[in-house]
């Protein structure tokens, strides 16, 4: 009678205890038919998921999974998993588990955290968001030291808290295109054999790619790194695309840190560095910062670029540190150099621009760099050398690279000569040395007077022009004169002649430096 009661209690225990649970330590086996029934009912427990994966694949959609899914006891999962638009009402614990078949979690929503530390995925992993349903992980996602042997995609997925991929190995490609990160994103010491895509979307806190190794193309285009990006010491052997990305926030810490990193081609065209950007001791094959905006300073100290470094159209606010920066060719908006951190760095980069531009045949850029370089030298001089440099070398001579400067000075000299001839003629009229044309009467007289003034101006202007251009001075010697006036006039005319000839010579020298053909002709002349 006592054994009967115990037997009945055992039957009740089997009925009451859910599938996959144990009674008095005994494991109740689950059948494939029961797994199929759970899938058809669109609801299954986390424990049942574990038990079903020991028997067969899971192929479901719009499935609700209650509780945590803990697969650590399985060690290896040899069946594929397809669970599209599924909702896991708990965490996913798969640390150190090996998955030999593909995983399709498109549209999945995990209301908990993922612990995938040390997990191995030997087949593709798909976890893309779908616009029709909320998708992502509300808790933390820890894939540190995980290995992905095939392609992985987390496109448009939402990570509510920290996402950690430190030390992970991606033996193929990985994509986070459009993924949203509510906290930080950690990719320190990762190794990626294929392409790495992190374009679009926003990372609210710091993104770290320090000491990572990226063998393929890295695409960070249009990504908003609100907490900044730190890729110090990383190695990028493929092309790196930072175009249109935003790094940091106004008033925040460093928005971009690439110190000691190694790159192939770097394209940061149109990028915005909202806070300070540190790109020190970087080595790159080429650097493109065209149309980029550095709003809080850019530090390129010690960076070496084997090919061209282009800053064309860049907006550079704050300090621009280019000390020991080197590139085979530099394309930089000369006007942006007012923000260079130090005088020696400013002079060094201008010299580099002039030399590389002249070697490339870009005479205009070379002349602009030369002019600005001499401006910098002149402004750093002491009084009165600084003032003399500004008047004679910069404004009158154009530093021999701006032909309009001496031409403008020559025109002003001719106007001064015209005005001086007005004064001399007026003085001679007063002293009776020059005949005065009588004034007319009435309207006819006014018309005659206006015509006389125009004719007088043109006559004096032409005399000043001829005096400036004639090959010989044609100055009457004042020797023997008893008054001072002839000596003064002769001295002024001699000054006019000498100054005009000097300005003409300087103009042709500037023109020779300004025009590539004339420069070659002048350079071929041997004295």
Model feature map: region roles:
Residues 347-361, 422-452:
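Hydrophobic alpha-helical transmembrane segments
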Residues 401-425, 501:
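Selective detector of the "anchor" transmembrane alpha-helix that sits immediately C-terminal
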Residues 383-406, 434-499, 506, 510, ...:
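Pore-loop/selectivity-filter region of tetrameric P-loop cation channels
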Residues 416-432, 505-524:
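Juxtamembrane "helix exit" motif at the C-terminal ends of alpha-helical transmembrane segments
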Residues 5-9, 413, 458:
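Small-residue packing motifs within transmembrane alpha-helices
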Residues 1-26:
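Secretory targeting and sorting signals
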Residues 23-392:
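N-terminal leader/targeting and pre-domain segments
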């Amino acid at each position: 009678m006592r054994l009967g009661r115990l037997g009945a209690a055992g039957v009740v225990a089997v009925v009451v205890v859910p599938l996959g649970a144990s009674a008095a330590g005994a494991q109740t086996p689950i059948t494939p038919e029961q797994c199929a029934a759970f899938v058809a009912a669109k609801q299954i427990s986390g424990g049942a998921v574990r038990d079903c994966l020991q028997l067969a694949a899971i192929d479901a959609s719009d499935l609700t999974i209650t509780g945590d899914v803990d697969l650590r006891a399985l060690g290896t999962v040899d069946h594929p998993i397809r669970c599209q638009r599924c909702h896991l009402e708990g965490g996913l614990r798969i640390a150190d588990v090996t998955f030999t078949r593909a995983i399709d979690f498109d549209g999945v929503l995990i209301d908990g955290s993922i612990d995938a530390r040390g997990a191995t995925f030997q087949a593709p992993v798909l976890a893309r968001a779908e616009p029709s349903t909320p998708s992502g992980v509300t808790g933390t996602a820890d894939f540190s030291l995980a290995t992905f042997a095939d392609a992985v995609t987390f496109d448009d997925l939402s990570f509510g808290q920290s996402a950690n991929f430190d030390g992970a190995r991606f033996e193929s490609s990985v994509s986070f295109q459009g993924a949203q990160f509510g906290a930080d994103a950690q990719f320190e010491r990762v190794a990626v054999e294929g392409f790495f895509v992190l374009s679009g979307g926003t990372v609210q806190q710091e993104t770290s790619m320090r000491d990572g190794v990226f063998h393929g193309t890295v695409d960070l285009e249009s990504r908003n790194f609100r907490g900044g990006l730190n890729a110090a010491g990383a190695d990028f052997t493929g092309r790196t695309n930072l175009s249109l990305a935003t790094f940091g926030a106004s008033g925040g810490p460093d928005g971009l840190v690439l110190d000691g990193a190694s790159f192939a081609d770097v394209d940061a065209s149109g990028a915005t560095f909202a806070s300070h950007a540190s790109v020190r001791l970087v080595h790159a094959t080429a650097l493109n910062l065209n149309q980029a905006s550095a709003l809080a300073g850019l530090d390129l100290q010690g960076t070496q670029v084997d090919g061209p470094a282009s800053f064309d159209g860049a907006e550079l606010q704050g300090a621009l540190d280019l000390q020991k920066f080197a590139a085979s060719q530099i394309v930089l908006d000369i006007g942006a150099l007012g923000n260079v951190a130090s005088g020696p760095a400013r002079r060094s980069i201008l010299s580099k621009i002039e030399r590389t531009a002249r070697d490339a045949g870009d005479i205009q850029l070379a002349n602009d760099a030369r002019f600005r370089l001499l401006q910098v030298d002149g402004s750093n001089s002491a009084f009165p050398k600084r003032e003399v440099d500004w008047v004679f070398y910069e404004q009158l001579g154009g530093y021999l690279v701006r032909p309009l400067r001496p031409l403008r000075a020559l025109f002003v000299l001719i106007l001064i000569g015209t005005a001086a001839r007005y004064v001399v003629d007026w003085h001679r009229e007063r002293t009776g040395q020059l005949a005065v044309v009588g004034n007319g009467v009435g309207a006819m007289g006014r018309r005659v007077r206006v015509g006389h003034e125009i004719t007088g101006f043109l006559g004096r202007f032409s005399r000043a022009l001829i005096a400036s251009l004639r090959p010989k001075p044609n100055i009457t010697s004042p020797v023997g004169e008893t008054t001072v006036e002839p000596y003064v006039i002769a001295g002024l005319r001699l000054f006019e002649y000498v100054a005009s000839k000097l300005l003409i010579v300087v103009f042709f020298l500037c023109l020779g430096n300004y025009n590539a053909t004339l420069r070659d002709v002048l350079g071929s002349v041997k004295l």
